Amino acid sequence: MAFRTALRRVAAVNAAPATRLAGAGAGAATAARRSYATASQLTHPDPTEDSPSGKMVREHVPYMVTTYSRPPPVFVKGKGSYLWDLEDRKYLDFTSGIAVNSLGHCDEEFSKIIAEQAQELVHASNLYYNPWTGALSKLLVESTKASGGMHDASSVFVCNSGSEANEAGIKFARKVGKVLDPSGSKVEIVCFQNAFHGRTMGSLSATPNPKYQAPFAPMVPGFKVGTYNDIAAIPSLVTEKTCSVIVEPIQGEGGVMPATEEFLVALGKRCREVGALLHYDEIQCGLARTGTFWAHSSLPKEAHPDILTTAKAIGNGFPIAATIVNEHVASKIKVGDHGTTFGGNPLACRLAHYIVGRLADKQLQEGVKAKSEVFLRGFEKLRNKFPSLVKEVRGKGLILGLQLSEDPTPVIKAARERGLLVITAGTNTLRFVPSLLVTEGEIEEGLKILEESFEAVMVKA
């Protein structure tokens, strides 16, 4: 029953748009007579209720809180840029776990480290030192400075997830504000429209989207919302009452929207003027995804942050995150101000130490830039072939967005049923965040499937 309901939901979503995908034009009637690819013609038709995947979903769904609406495939294996489902069908993955698996699925050394460290020490708590928390912190600080980013990076708080990293940043900012102004008035935190910083109450309060906030209102007080890339509004937005400004150099969930250099420089300058902290959330766009170690690594020092948060790629699928701060922040944080039970455990930190070392490699970063060009050339061809459907290409490196004129859900389904996994972002945007080790051949393969998916959906329309 649950699987049938899930299938009905998917079908309803894909059948819902009454609007036609623009571009069918005068040939729409003729094109419509050509049958849309049937299940027998598709290479990866969604599993049926009676398939192994369908049976597993039907068994498990009643016991799972419905926080996600998932398509039918059940993935059981991954390697490099590919996933395999329960029916042993191979999918090219351009999502990498939502910008998580930057080294691809089941990297050999990554898997080896898990096995080795699990036999030595997994957890002993933060009441004691271990060899890897400090080693990871040192590597993060040194790699950050060497990259040209956050020139005064000083120390690191290690935790488990992006939301936790941002919560730490929010707490640290409030503490600094109270130290600087004991009256308690310097507590406001500025965030921006279309931002996404997490789902716990502090990070959610910095995520001004009614879809996420409304069911859990009221939010944590003291958050102000500004318009992304609006330089003129900064002086009135960031004031003496501001303790922190939290911003993504590239908004991921918000539609793959890059901040301009001028905007980030102006934010940094204003923060210094009023004694506020600048907090960059690079959870999705950081760690080599843009072709530099951090998305802000190419910015001048006046645009560097006081707080820098990272997660996702730092664990390549294993739960770990970090909040990097400068000495101005670190000097205000005392024993007992914050903590974490599992954060900084030796297994997670040893894995992250390996991953950060790989992602800090200049050759890998140059490879990201080269692969980005392959995507961009392919996207330009798609834009020329489907001008009324593909409106804009955004992003940098291997965090890219294709702005469509219509709901991309049918395209995502058509691509999945042809063996390609892509996801959405913002409004009508296809998001591409593949493994940073994706090959040019795999990119070309994915672009071909994407083109076929556009054609199939337009025929159906």
From Swiss-Prot:
Subcellular location field: Mitochondrion matrix
Metabolic or biological pathway, per its Swiss-Prot or TrEMBL entry: Amino-acid biosynthesis; L-arginine biosynthesis; N(2)-acetyl-L-ornithine from L-glutamate: step 4/4
First-tier enzyme category under EC: transferase
Protein's UniProt name: Acetylornithine aminotransferase, mitochondrial
Gene3D superfamilies associated with the record: Aspartate Aminotransferase, domain 1 (3.90.1150.10), Type I PLP-dependent aspartate aminotransferase-like (Major domain) (3.40.640.10)
GO BP annotation list: arginine biosynthetic process via ornithine; L-arginine biosynthetic process
Name of one Pfam family that matches: Aminotran_3
GO MF, one annotated term: identical protein binding
Provenance organism: Neurospora crassa (strain ATCC 24698 / 74-OR23-1A / CBS 708.71 / DSM 1257 / FGSC 987)
Major subcellular location class: mitochondrion
Keyword Amino-acid biosynthesis appears in the UniProt entry: yes
UniProt keyword terms in alphabetical order: Amino-acid biosynthesis, Aminotransferase, Arginine biosynthesis, Mitochondrion, Pyridoxal phosphate, Transferase, Transit peptide
